[in-house]
């Protein structure tokens, strides 16, 4: 019988914290499957899920306010360990008979907590040991309320001067709470604390590994698809590339990919996609060269949102035209990943299993009547990348910087023209090439060039010329929700600027974007 990699599982209940998905990613990194559900998950669904442990995540509410969210009683009836983090600790304390109150001194940012009690959760885990033998942890706090009275059978685990109950434990039941956030990297021992809870206290086995995920996904696809044929829109991005590699391994020639070349791709990207999948891996790929159709449809349009819609509609038209030429297609494959599923389920719905379809490809003709296959829908982006490596995709493809769906169409400000796209492609290629040479490509989260439809005077030899302006953009970010501009070395910027101006006729000036997000967005349009 095949190994069930979902057998040992953790349930995470979301109370609205910005860090909740990070908890799930940390649990997966430990090697254990987990799912994220709204705090008001149905009691029957909780029992059916049958977790080996439950994590109550943080949230922005105050436990002592009316109508603030509560943990379902079914969680405490399961008889499994429970770990409350921040708000999760507070609601657990209040629901089990303790008390929570607003704190005069709020704690946001770094803090040191003293470990003052023995417990299975924290024993042997520390950042400091004082001369008097007191253990200390460097942690990240983000709270305005605090537990003021322990529930029955709990003891104090950790404290700070302003938060005497910064951690609590009931070892007999395996119930623990901490006021700090072990899931963020600022809490230095956070990984060890979560690992202690998941592996030792809950007794989970680390079954969730890239090799086992690949085996399981291949088996699931074969079981779902059988001998039917599958269609995939291949973009060259990480998600669709991993889906293509996975499906090819699972069902071989039953897979057909349609690669739409819209004329707004990076330099040589179309050739690279065809070389990787069609030539090296033997995947059936139909390349639709639709540059002229896209550029004609975009002619005269300068509004960013309208450009996006035109590109999206044209993609659907081209994809539909190609897919209608194919016979006996029963399934449409999509690169839906777990964050898409979480967002679709919606907080406070209590019905996380009722997920709307993600039409990554768009409105396919109803007469095709295709069923969906979404082999990545349980995976976070970092897991998708690791799966890609496991399936044999090259590191540089799997860890390539994000590229917007509309491609260069939103990196050319204003109207999109072939001349602009050709200049931008070459400038972007030089920037990325120099980042790689200087070992900066993987130090930044995203880097690209933006074409600005304004001309600036330049000097070439003894003459003056008016030519176009481009901007370099490089950012550092963890989640792409906020980002800071990357402080690239001046020498590197000088090299990039010199090459672009000297090698590309038609560009006379290079600028560097030093805007962070917020207030600026990462992309210019």
UniProtKB/Swiss-Prot annotation:
GO terms for cellular component: cytosol. Pfam families: GATase (PF00117), GMP_synt_C (PF00958), NAD_synthase (PF02540). Pathway: Purine metabolism; GMP biosynthesis; GMP from XMP (L-Gln route): step 1/1. GO terms for molecular function: ATP binding; GMP synthase activity. Residues 9-207 form the Glutamine amidotransferase type-1 domain. The active site is at residues 86, 181, 183. InterPro entries: Class_I_gatase-like, GATASE, GMP_synth_C, GMP_synth_GATase, GMP_synthase, GMPS_ATP_PPase_dom, NAD/GMP_synthase, Rossmann-like_a/b/a_fold. Its EC number is 6.3.5.2. Keywords: ATP-binding, Glutamine amidotransferase, GMP biosynthesis, Ligase, Nucleotide-binding, Purine biosynthesis. ATP binds at residues 235-241. It catalyses: XMP + L-glutamine + ATP + H2O = GMP + L-glutamate + AMP + diphosphate + 2 H(+). Residues 208-400 form the GMPS ATP-PPase domain. Homodimer. Catalyzes the synthesis of GMP from XMP. This is GMP synthase [glutamine-hydrolyzing].
């Amino acid at each position: 019988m095949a190994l069930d990699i979902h057998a040992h599982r953790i349930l995470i209940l979301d109370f609205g914290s910005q860090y909740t998905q990070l908890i799930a990613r940390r649990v997966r990194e430990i090697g254990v499957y987990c799912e994220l559900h709204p705090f008001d998950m149905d009691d029957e669904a909780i029992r059916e899920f049958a977790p080996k442990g439950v994590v109550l995540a943080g949230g922005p509410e105050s436990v002592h306010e009316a109508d603030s969210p509560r943990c379902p009683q079914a969680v405490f009836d399961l008889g499994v360990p429970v770990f409350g983090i921040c708000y999760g600790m507070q609601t657990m304390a209040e629901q089990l008979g303790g008390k929570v109150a607003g704190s005069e001194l709020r704690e946001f940012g770094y803090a040191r907590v003293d470990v003052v009690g023995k417990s299975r959760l924290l024993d042997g885990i520390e950042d400091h040991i004082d001369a008097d033998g007191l253990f200390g942890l460097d942690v990240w706090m983000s709270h305005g309320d605090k537990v003021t009275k322990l529930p029955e059978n709990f003891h104090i685990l950790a404290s700070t001067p302003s938060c005497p109950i910064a951690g609590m434990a009931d070892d007999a039941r395996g119930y623990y709470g901490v006021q700090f956030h072990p899931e963020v990297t600022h809490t230095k021992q956070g990984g060890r604390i979560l690992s202690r809870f998941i592996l030792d206290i809950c007794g989970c086995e680390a079954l969730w590994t890239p090799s086992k995920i690949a085996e399981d996904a291949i088996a699931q696809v074969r079981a779902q698809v059988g001998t039917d044929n599958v269609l995939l829109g291949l973009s060259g991005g990480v998600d669709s590339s991993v889906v293509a590699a996975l499906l090819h391994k699972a069902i071989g020639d039953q897979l057909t990919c349609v690669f739409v070349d819209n004329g707004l791709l990076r330099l040589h990207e179309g050739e690279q996609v065809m070389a990787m999948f069609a030539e090296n891996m033997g995947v059936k790929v139909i390349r639709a060269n639709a540059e002229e159709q896209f550029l004609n449809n975009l002619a005269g349009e300068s509004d960013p949102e309208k450009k996006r819609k035109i590109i999206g509609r044209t993609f659907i038209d081209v994809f539909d035209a190609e897919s209608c030429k194919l016979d006996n297609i029963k399934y449409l494959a999509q690169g839906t990943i777990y964050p898409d599923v979480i967002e679709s389920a919606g907080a406070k719905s209590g019905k996380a299993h009722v997920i709307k379809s993600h039409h990554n490809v768009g409105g396919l003709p109803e007469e095709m009547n295709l069923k969906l296959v979404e082999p990545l829908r349980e995976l976070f982006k970092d897991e998708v990348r690791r799966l890609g490596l496991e399936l044999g995709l090259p590191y540089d493809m799997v860890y390539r910087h994000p590229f917007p769906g509309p491609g260069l169409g939103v990196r050319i400000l204003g109207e999109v023209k072939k001349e602009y796209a050709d200049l931008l492609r070459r400038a972007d290629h030089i920037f990325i090439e120099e980042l790689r040479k200087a070992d900066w490509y993987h130090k930044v989260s995203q880097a690209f060039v933006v074409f600005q439809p304004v001309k600036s005077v330049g000097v070439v030899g003894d003459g003056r010329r008016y030519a176009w302006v481009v901007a370099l953009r490089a950012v550092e970010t963890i989640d792409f929700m906020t980002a800071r501009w990357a402080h690239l070395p001046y020498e590197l910027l000088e090299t990039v600027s010199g090459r672009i101006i000297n090698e590309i006729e038609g560009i006379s000036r290079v600028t560097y974007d030093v805007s962070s997000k917020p207030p600026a967005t990462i992309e210019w349009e």
